[in-house]
């Protein structure tokens, strides 16, 4: 079993935003190495925590790490994608919760495990599946999907400056034979991107790998589905805290929270009494909470992190 050495970002800030009730019911939608789960468990007395992860490695690791809490019925691990939030909780007879935390960063363990195919720094099969039970892999996308579909993925999810060039080069190479490994794909990307652009802005394969990972795991679709359910599951005064690491996710969270906390559109001239049309939710963070300078120095992966929160009225 892989040892989780994942450093949880904005650990205390994300949990503090939930204002934990020791007897409440909580959800960690992204169990990972169990950092947020552990922090919530410390603050619970008779409360319960339901922690989700689609990654079998994370579930097995935390079954050992939190064996006592699981045996005591304080922690329930759920091996599901967080888009199954409502269904999975209903199976546990839970229909309302007091708080939910999301940490949308890919686990360091997933990046650093060369066999998972997430990283352009390790040579491995082009996999990128968070959930090993699913069939779609990055290898399937680059070898079997039409040019226009690959172009759409690179443009939409990678925010790439050269999506057409990369997609075209992938098409040319796969005509000669299948693209099987991460390093094969890295070489193709380097070949596609103009030399001056390769020398700045980080690793040239970064955005392409991000785009493929998001597509393989339908990350944005799953996030939107899950947040929609999470907002409905919140009890009055219940809270959600979300840590994002890239602009696509942050934009989605910001937009969904803004829609839920805005006044409804009303006909012009309609007499409205104060408090008559209050939104059901309020923002806890007008601007996102960012990591401290110390945290960013100690953990460079935290640099892009943003924390947002919302509360049900």
Swiss-Prot record:
Q: Which domain of life is it from?
A: Bacteria
* Molecular function in Gene Ontology: rRNA (cytosine-N4-)-methyltransferase activity
List the GO biological process terms: rRNA base methylation
Alphabetic keyword roster: Cytoplasm, Methyltransferase, rRNA processing, S-adenosyl-L-methionine, Transferase
Uppermost EC category: transferase
| Pfam families cross-referenced by the UniProt entry | Methyltransf_5
Q: Which reaction does it catalyse?
A: cytidine(1402) in 16S rRNA + S-adenosyl-L-methionine = N(4)-methylcytidine(1402) in 16S rRNA + S-adenosyl-L-homocysteine + H(+)
Hydrolase is among the record's keywords: no
Q: What is its EC number?
A: 2.1.1.199
Per UniProt, where does S-adenosyl-L-methionine bind? Answer: 34-36, 53, 82, 103, 110
Query: Positions of the region Disordered?
Result: 289-313
Output compositional bias ranges, type Basic and acidic residues. Answer: 297-313
| Function summary | Specifically methylates the N4 position of cytidine in position 1402 (C1402) of 16S rRNA.
Protein name in the entry: Ribosomal RNA small subunit methyltransferase H
